[in-house]
């Protein structure tokens, strides 16, 4: 728990997502997980990890809201929605996900929705009322980074069309700081992290690296990268060059 606390501090995160489980809230020393989290500093985001049906995801979301309402945490109406398709890939069930979004939005939730990198599915989730869409870079916990850059770019384009402030967060598959930087350079508003830090040889150092990758990627996006071209463009002027130029 202390390692988790130090890693969170190193990352400078503002939101912590927590899976809702039927487990004891206290560890063997009688301490609660929440004792290690500064509730005035962090917003707690309950998630429905492990749910394979829309019905289960809705029930878990409501349980999470009840818990956070007792803590007066601003994330009480938030839920990170996951409706998984199978245990092997942990890829989302698109039909169940959409059903759960519609139900939870009607129930007053601000839904931050995990989905695949399919731009059409992402757009339908937004149209159903999700507060944020979270396309996967690659399968959960795989560490493969952003496998399909084009699809993430299309998701960003569709979701932010006429709505540039709509939050798009790359969720799942991140393995290292360069993955975070790439996601932010593409224009994502944030990246969800867990395994890449928790399973790193030095989680605290990796959390530092992820923060720097996030900052660098965002600054690069805002600065505006040069366009990619097939041929070279000399960075120094050719006029006055003391050399023979082939073909001229």
Q: Residue spans of the language-model regions?
A:
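Alpha/beta enzyme core
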Residues: 1-15, 28-43, 52-171, 175-195, ...
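A short beta-strand-loop structural module common to alpha/beta enzyme folds
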Residues: 14-22
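Short, motif-level signal for alpha-helix interfacial/capping segments enriched in acidic residues
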Residues: 25
């Amino acid at each position: 728990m202390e390692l988790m606390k130090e890693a969170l501090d190193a990352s400078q995160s503002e939101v912590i997502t927590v899976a809702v489980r039927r487990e004891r809230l206290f560890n063997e020393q009688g301490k609660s997980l929440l004792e290690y989290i500064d509730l005035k500093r962090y917003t707690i985001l309950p998630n429905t990890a492990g749910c394979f049906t829309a019905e289960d995801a809705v029930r878990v979301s409501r349980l999470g809201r009840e818990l956070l309402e007792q803590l007066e945490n601003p994330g009480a109406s938030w839920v990170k929605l996951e409706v998984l398709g199978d245990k092997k890939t942990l890829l989302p069930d698109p039909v169940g996900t959409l059903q759960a979004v519609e139900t939870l939005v009607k129930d007053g939730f601000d839904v931050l929705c995990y989905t695949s990198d399919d731009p059409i599915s992402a757009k339908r989730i937004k149209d159903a009322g999700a507060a944020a869409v979270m396309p996967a870079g690659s399968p959960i916990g795989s560490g493969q980074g952003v496998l399909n850059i084009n699809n993430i770019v299309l998701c960003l384009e569709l979701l932010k069309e006429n709505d540039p402030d709509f939050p798009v967060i790359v969720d799942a598959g991140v393995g290292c700081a360069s993955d975070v930087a790439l996601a932010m350079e593409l224009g994502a508003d944030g990246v969800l992290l867990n395994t890449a830090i928790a399973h790193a040889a030095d989680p605290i150092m990796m959390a530092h690296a992820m923060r720097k990758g996030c900052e660098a990627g965002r600054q690069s996006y805002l600065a505006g990268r040069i366009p990619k071209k097939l041929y070279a463009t000399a960075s120094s002027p050719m006029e006055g060059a003391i050399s023979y130029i082939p073909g001229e």
